């Protein structure tokens, strides 16, 4: 057997001494079972005892049975709750008794009586029979989605616009009218100002007067009605020139330009725009912002460009207007005093 020498034992003892000495096997001392209880246990027992005593004092005692006692239950009667009240014929037999068989004669059938039928039970078919009795399903045709439409302008649109301006002689940059550069998806084909003026010249005089007076008021509407409906057949450029020089003329031109949105919705009957709520909002906005002397200045400019015949027509229109509508007399007085401004 291998045995260490003295040097080895000394080294081992030194190591064990440096680490705290050898590990000894100690016996675990166990406490002896005593009958003493802890203080917490004694308090708990005392509390339980007090609660039991309180319940015994408060709870009333059950009265004693003075009569004869009932016989003890037999062991069979303890299983009565397991027995069902269903008759035997319903539990063991599938056929109901004779008194429960429903018999209906011809008279009852004639009166509308029906035999109670059992509920329909789902039937099971093998898979091959299911495929046989159903028609073969036809595959649906694949519907290709419509291509996406991308709304974008052409890249060379500005080139064409510049060429058109050069051809027309519009070398200076022109400020577009309000609403001209807008994009409206609801109205694809918006009428231009020339098309609006041309349409107002061609429609009947009564409808034209109704649209213009409803949009610009009585005084300005009558003057514009005489300009557009005169037998002189004025061009749209001349009408725009006369209206453009007047204070508030840009507002009138912009309103007529905005009228192109409304007239494009009703191309067959332009008189329907008078019932449109957009037309009413436009008329309220224009009549609130138009200057006071626009009608007199417009009549003055038209008299200078057209001549003395315009003043006579205006006087006749004002006399008819005052006679038919007395409430329009204060607005017609300044226009009735307009005289030819020719030398």
From Swiss-Prot:
Subcellular localization, as worded in the UniProt entry: Virion
Residue segments, region Disordered: 18-100
Keyword field contains Cell membrane: no
Basic residues compositional bias, start-end: 22-41
Compositional bias segments (type: Basic and acidic residues): 42-56, 88-100
Keywords: Virion
Primary location class: virion
One Gene Ontology cellular component: virion component
Homology family: Belongs to the atadenoviridae p32K protein family.
Protein name, entry field: Structural protein p32K
Organism of derivation: Snake adenovirus serotype 1
């Amino acid at each position: 057997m291998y045995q260490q020498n003295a040097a080895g034992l000394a080294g081992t003892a030194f190591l064990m001494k440096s680490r705290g000495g050898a590990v000894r096997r100690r016996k675990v001392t166990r406490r002896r079972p005593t009958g003493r209880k802890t203080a917490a246990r004694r308090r708990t027992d005392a509390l339980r005892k007090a609660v039991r005593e309180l319940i015994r004092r408060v709870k009333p005692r059950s009265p004693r049975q003075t009569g004869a006692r009932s016989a003890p239950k037999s062991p069979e009667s303890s299983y009565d709750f397991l027995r069902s009240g269903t008759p035997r014929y319903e539990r063991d037999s599938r056929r109901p008794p004779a008194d429960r068989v429903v018999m209906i004669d011809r008279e009852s059938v004639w009166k509308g009586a029906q035999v109670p039928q059992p509920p329909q039970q789902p039937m099971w078919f093998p898979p091959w029979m299911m495929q046989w009795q159903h028609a073969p399903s036809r595959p649906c045709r694949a519907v290709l989605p419509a291509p996406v439409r991308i709304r974008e302008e052409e890249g060379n649109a500005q080139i064409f616009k510049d060429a058109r301006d050069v051809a027309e002689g519009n070398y200076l940059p022109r400020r577009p009218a309000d609403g001209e550069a807008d994009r409206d998806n609801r109205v694809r084909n918006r009428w231009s100002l020339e098309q609006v003026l041309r349409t107002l010249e061609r429609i009947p005089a009564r409808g034209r007067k109704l649209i213009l007076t409803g949009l610009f008021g009585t005084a300005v509407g009558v003057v514009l009605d005489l300009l557009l409906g005169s037998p002189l057949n004025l061009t749209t450029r001349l009408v725009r020139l006369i209206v453009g020089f007047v204070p508030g003329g840009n507002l009138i031109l912009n309103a007529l330009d905005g009228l192109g949105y409304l007239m494009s919705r009703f191309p067959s009957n332009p008189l329907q725009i008078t019932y449109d709520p957009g037309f009413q909002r436009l008329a309220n906005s224009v009549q609130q912002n138009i200057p006071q002397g626009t009608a007199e200045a417009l009549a003055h400019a038209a008299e200078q460009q057209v001549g003395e015949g315009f003043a006579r027509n205006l006087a006749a229109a004002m006399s008819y207007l005052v006679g038919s509508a007395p409430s329009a007399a204060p607005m017609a007085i300044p226009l009735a005093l307009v005289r030819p401004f020719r030398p």
